[in-house]
């Protein structure tokens, strides 16, 4: 008991004196609770057993009522260095904690440390409202967390914020929910509101993130660093000067630069995603070319976050692609991919621009990430291989780097690490007008028609997008008359024959036969089949093993051979009964006459023989 507090007798507890003292402290939650405990202990010592009921009755009789609300409705947050002052209703909010008197003359404790909402974030794309919450566990400074209202206003979900060092548990979760909801309701016109976005690139209202005023990031916290890396720094003229010096050369780094600009026009002109892959030995400047592409939009420095490697999971890559959205996805060190054959599925995923549908822990489905962009990659080897599916080869422009891409790569790095982010913002400002979008669409058609007919439709499309973006960047940014031409890109486009998996599968089987011709002779051991004129008869089990070893589908390859007129098939089967060592056995009977330059036929993607 406080030494300055009078010791009341049992008789005095039947008077107003002790309760008047208590009423005087009603607006100071902590002092009120201290005095209540002292008086209650005093009552117990003198044998007075009705202190709680008497105190409750006195308070009820003497509290002032205004418009049906208790006078405590005028309480305000009283935190040291608070970012905003808010009405708290009947909550006492100070550095000692957040308390409220309950009907039993005790205290409901919402939180033992300062916490309050400071901003309302409305997502541009889906309208979801989140709150920025600030809290302080000590006097070292305020911290913040952004959470959905469905989390903050649920006594079960809010307990997840304990991982952020907010003091919340089963004990106080319900009271903390009430406190936060009361503050938002009482201060709806006081708490500032801002538009928010969870990704980079074009938004549903036609604007471009992050180049919008009063825009806040409300996405996954692990992407905040990348979001903040997209900004301008240093002098635009210095970046422009070094970049123009690269464009004066014939370096393929010019294509990497064009791809960086091209990424944001893919959605604008309604075309498909594609990949640009630089490969070759170390020391050629592949990574510097990628960093030059990064510097168009943001910070290319180590640790800035935008420039990533292949050292991650498929799910992580999917989420990253959905986050960068329309800006280029730039990945280094393809050699980190352990299973390069299965990487084709990643290529399809990146170029399709949509992630997998997944269930949510709370039921229903998670939001499926989508994106429309260009992926710029590098490594020591090409992504595609002999048995790659046509769909994968079709979507990638691969450039082998045998010679140095820069005359002085170190100088390029020094400049772009201190001067970056200006060109992308300027390019986007031009590109956001309707006139520019129409111009881009017209240029695309023009370039598409100018590219030779030897490459596939998807390869031609990707090349036309690169040429369109570079032409616009030349006009709007560089003004140097050094735009890329079709002749600059065509050498790197896959031909229709190279993309045709059936043709490559036939070539693989043909090469196998040539290198194992002795095993097709009579009485050879082992025996793989027989030969009759130009027709090579491969035993069914051997043919299927050859295809499996090369990564081809036996059935799909037989179908292609049939369509191309190279298969002698049975009456109701692609395999045919033939004599091998005097015995009838089912074989793949393939006409291996010398190739004709016009023999290959176009086959739809769905019929192509890849696994």
Name these PLM-found stretches.
Residues 214-303:
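P-loop NTPase catalytic core of nucleic-acid-dependent motor ATPases
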Residues 333, 372-382, 400-402:
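A short beta-strand-to-loop transition that corresponds to the Sensor-1 phosphate-sensing loop
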């Amino acid at each position: 008991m406080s030494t300055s507090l009078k010791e009341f007798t049992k008789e005095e507890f039947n008077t107003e004196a002790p309760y008047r003292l208590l009423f005087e402290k009603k607006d100071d939650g902590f002092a009120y609770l201290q005095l209540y405990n002292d008086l209650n202990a005093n009552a117990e010592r003198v044998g007075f057993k009705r202190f709680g009921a008497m105190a409750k009755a006195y308070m009820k009789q003497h509290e002032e009522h205004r418009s049906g609300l208790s006078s405590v409705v005028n309480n305000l947050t009283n935190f040291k260095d608070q970012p905003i002052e808010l009405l708290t209703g009947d909550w006492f909010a100070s550095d000692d904690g957040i308390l409220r008197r309950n009907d039993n003359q005790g205290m409901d404790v919402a939180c033992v440390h300062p916490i309050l909402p400071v901003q309302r974030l409305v997502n541009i794309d889906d309208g979801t409202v989140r709150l920025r919450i600030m809290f302080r566990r000590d006097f070292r400074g305020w911290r913040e967390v952004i959470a959905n209202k469905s989390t903050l206003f649920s006594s079960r979900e809010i307990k997840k914020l304990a991982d952020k060092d907010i003091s919340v548990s089963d004990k106080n979760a319900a009271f903390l929910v009430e406190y936060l909801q009361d503050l938002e309701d009482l201060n709806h016109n006081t708490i500032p509101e801002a538009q928010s976005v969870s990704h980079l690139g074009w938004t549903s209202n036609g604007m471009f993130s992050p180049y919008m005023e009063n825009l806040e990031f409300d996405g996954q916290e692990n992407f905040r660093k990348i979001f903040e890396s997209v900004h301008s720094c240093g002098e635009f003229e210095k970046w422009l000067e070094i970049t123009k010096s690269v464009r004066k050369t014939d370096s393929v780094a010019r294509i990497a630069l064009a791809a960086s600009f091209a990424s944001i026009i893919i959605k604008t002109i309604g075309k498909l995603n594609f990949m640009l892959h630089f490969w070759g030995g170390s020391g050629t400047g592949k990574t510097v070319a990628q960093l030059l592409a990064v510097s168009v939009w943001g910070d290319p420095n180590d640790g800035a976050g935008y420039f990533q490697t292949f050292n991650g999971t498929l799910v992580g890559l999917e989420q990253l692609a959905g986050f960068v959205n329309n800006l280029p996805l730039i990945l280094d060190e393809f050699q980190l991919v352990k299973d390069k054959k299965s990487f084709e599925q990643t290529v399809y995923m990146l170029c399709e621009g949509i992630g997998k549908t997944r269930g949510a822990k709370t039921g229903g489905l998670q939001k499926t990430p989508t994106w429309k962009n260009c992926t710029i990659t590098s490594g020591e080897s090409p992504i595609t291989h002999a048995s790659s599916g046509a769909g994968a080869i079709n979507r990638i422009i691969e450039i082998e780097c045998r010679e140095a891409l820069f005359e002085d790569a170190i100088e390029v790095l020094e400049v772009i690490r201190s001067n970056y982010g200006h060109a992308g913002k300027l390019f986007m400002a031009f590109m956001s007008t309707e006139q520019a979008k129409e111009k881009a669409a017209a240029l695309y058609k023009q370039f598409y028609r100018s590219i030779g007919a030897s490459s596939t439709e998807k390869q031609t499309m990707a090349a036309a997008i690169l040429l369109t973006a570079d032409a616009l960047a030349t006009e709007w940014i560089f003004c140097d008359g050094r735009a890329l031409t079709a002749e600059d890109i065509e050498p790197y486009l896959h031909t229709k024959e190279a993309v045709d998996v059936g043709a490559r599968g036939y070539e693989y089987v043909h090469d196998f036969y040539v290198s194992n011709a002795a095993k097709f002779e009579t009485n050879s051991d082992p025996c793989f089949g027989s030969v009759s004129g130009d027709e090579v008869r491969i035993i069914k089990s051997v043919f299927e093993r050859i295809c499996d070893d090369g990564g081809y589908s036996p059935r799909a390859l037989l179908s292609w051979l049939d369509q191309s007129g190279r298969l002698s098939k049975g009456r109701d089967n692609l395999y045919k009964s033939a004599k091998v060592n005097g015995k009838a056995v089912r074989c793949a009977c393939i006409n291996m006459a010398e190739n004709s330059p016009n023999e290959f036929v176009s086959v739809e993607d769905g019929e192509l023989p890849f696994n």
